[in-house]
């Protein structure tokens, strides 16, 4: 389905611009993208829902129409950015993926006005051991040295996002392959494209969010907002299934749905870096849950 998007922006609490795309008509619904994505990454999902909802696709900081991360960036910052979009749009419906699923849950816990939220494979860590977040120091060093490919490898391995075969390949070989792919994209992408190289610095902040909420599952035990938990059946990062099952036990007002054949990136558009993209399979669940017309 081809739809027209209109660009806009709001100002977050600290003065940072938060850009967004808007399409459709009906009740306002905010779709918040995950790591290594931008608002555009959810264009297919937005298009599929645009006949029932006015869909907003914010760019989280550091990409697209939004301003940069600032020192002290935290989960609270992410919630404040979402709050600015919610206030502008009047939205009471929110969907988040992975780390943004955690942002959505925290927003529902701390902000008034979110009536329903859906979270796809929220990236919640059940303990604060640092096993999935202590890669950031190495990542920052590699990025500062201009070794973008190496930094991405560090992130993929640190988050357990790398395919099984990658885990047995030399880091140098993996980094060279990613560097070559980025150079090709740099040559061929239009000037306004949100390329992998532009996206790479944002990856550290996904770890910041996960680390901040690690071991804090009990925070959501009193959440009264209506929640839909979604996950696919394909294997994702090792911490995703335990987090899903723990939230399924703890959340007091929710239901959970397992979508056969989907993976961690399925809500976003299919691309070279997201071969499992299948927004058409996710949209019907969101439509039913948020109350759109069938």
Where are these regions (language model features)?
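Conserved alpha/beta-hydrolase "acid-adjacent" motif
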Residues: 236-243
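Active-site loop/oxyanion-hole signature of alpha/beta-hydrolase fold enzymes
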Residues: 56-95, 99, 273-280
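Alpha/beta-hydrolase active-site loop signature
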Residues: 36, 60-64, 124, 261-266
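Catalytic active-site module of serine/aspartate enzymes centered on a nucleophile-bearing elbow/loop
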Residues: 253-294
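Short beta-strand/loop motif that positions the catalytic acidic residue
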Residues: 223, 229-231
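Conserved HGGG/HGGXW glycine-rich cap/lid loop of the alpha/beta-hydrolase fold
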Residues: 9-71
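Hydrophobic, aromatic-rich cap/lid helix
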Residues: 176-215
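Conserved hydrolase catalytic core segment
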Residues: 91-130
């Amino acid at each position: 389905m081809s739809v027209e998007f209109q660009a806009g922006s709001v100002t977050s609490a600290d003065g940072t611009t938060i850009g967004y795309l808007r399409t459709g008509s009906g009740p306002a619904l905010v779709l918040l993208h995950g790591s290594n994505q931008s608002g555009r990454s959810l264009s297919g999902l937005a298009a599929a829902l645009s006949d029932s909802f006015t869909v907003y696709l914010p760019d989280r900081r550091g990409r697209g129409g939004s301003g940069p991360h600032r020192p002290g960036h935290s989960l609270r910052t992410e919630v404040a950015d979402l709050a600015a979009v919610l206030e502008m749009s009047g939205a009471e419906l929110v969907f988040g993926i992975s780390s943004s699923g955690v942002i959505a849950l925290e927003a529902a816990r701390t902000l008034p006005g979110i009536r329903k939220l859906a979270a796809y494979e929220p990236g919640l860590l059940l303990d604060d051991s640092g096993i999935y977040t202590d890669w950031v120091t190495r990542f920052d060093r590699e990025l500062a040295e201009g070794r973008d490919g190496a930094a991405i490898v560090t992130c993929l391995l640190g988050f357990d996002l790398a395919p099984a075969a990658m885990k047995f390949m030399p880091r140098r070989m993996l980094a060279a392959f990613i560097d070559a792919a980025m150079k090709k994209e740099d040559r061929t992408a239009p000037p306004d494209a949100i390329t992998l190289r532009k996206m790479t610095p944002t990856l550290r902040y996904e770890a910041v969010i996960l680390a901040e909420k690690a071991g804090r599952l009990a925070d959501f035990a009193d959440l009264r907002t209506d929640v839909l938990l979604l996950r696919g059946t394909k294997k994702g990062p090792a911490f995703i299934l335990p987090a899903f099952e723990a939230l399924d036990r703890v959340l007091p007002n929710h239901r959970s749905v397992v979508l056969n054949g989907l993976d961690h990136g399925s809500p976003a558009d299919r691309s070279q870096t997201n071969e499992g993209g299948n927004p058409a399979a996710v949209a019907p669940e969101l439509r039913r849950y948020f109350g759109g017309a069938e």
